[in-house]
């Protein structure tokens, strides 16, 4: 009788401590694209190699899912499909399939796109941040972070610091920068990596070339007519920076 009582307690304990439903609420970013770019590779190639989407924002309580890439935000209804699997329905305009694999959120492959893997950001998201900014801040930190020395160009010998929030110091009068991650700026750059440099609301687009620890910043020459979409081509080099 004593053995039967012990066995019953063990079975009851097992029933009360079963696996809890997994909550995937929160932000997930395309860390694979960041890791690839941070090895010193051309930025757009690194992003293209790891999928179109850059960030997922999920709220399981309201059954909403938002996905962002470099130029648009999509929002759909999150529908549980099976344990650890969900469907995102974009109001009848297509679906995405999501699956949790350990600590990664997988966006399943479709006939047009390869599968993508997303992870939780290492740094917490900034409150009320614009869509896509968590990915962008993580990319800025990994790809542009640290100290850069001006080897050639205005301010030679100066140290330049690109911050995660898009601010920059030591690069002439510029105090803001923004990397082009795709969309119109990528089309205008005709395959070249581009970034915006400016002070306040005044600035210009530049073409940059990244090879390992060296970063060339070139003038972007617009070959289009004033009433046409800009088509930028590399011009003279303005700066050569080297990561310290």
Give the predicted meaning of each segment:
Residues 133, 137-169:
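Surface-exposed interaction/gating patches
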Residues 33-42, 48-104, 152-158, 168-243:
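Contiguous, well-ordered beta-strand patches that form the walls/edges
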Residues 4-13:
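Sec-dependent N-terminal signal peptides
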Residues 15-29, 128-147:
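N-terminal helix-cap/turn-to-beta initiation motif at the start of protein domains
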Residues 105-137:
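Short, structured interface segments
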Residues 29, 119, 149, 163, ...:
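Residue-level detector of conserved, well-ordered beta-strand and adjacent loop positions
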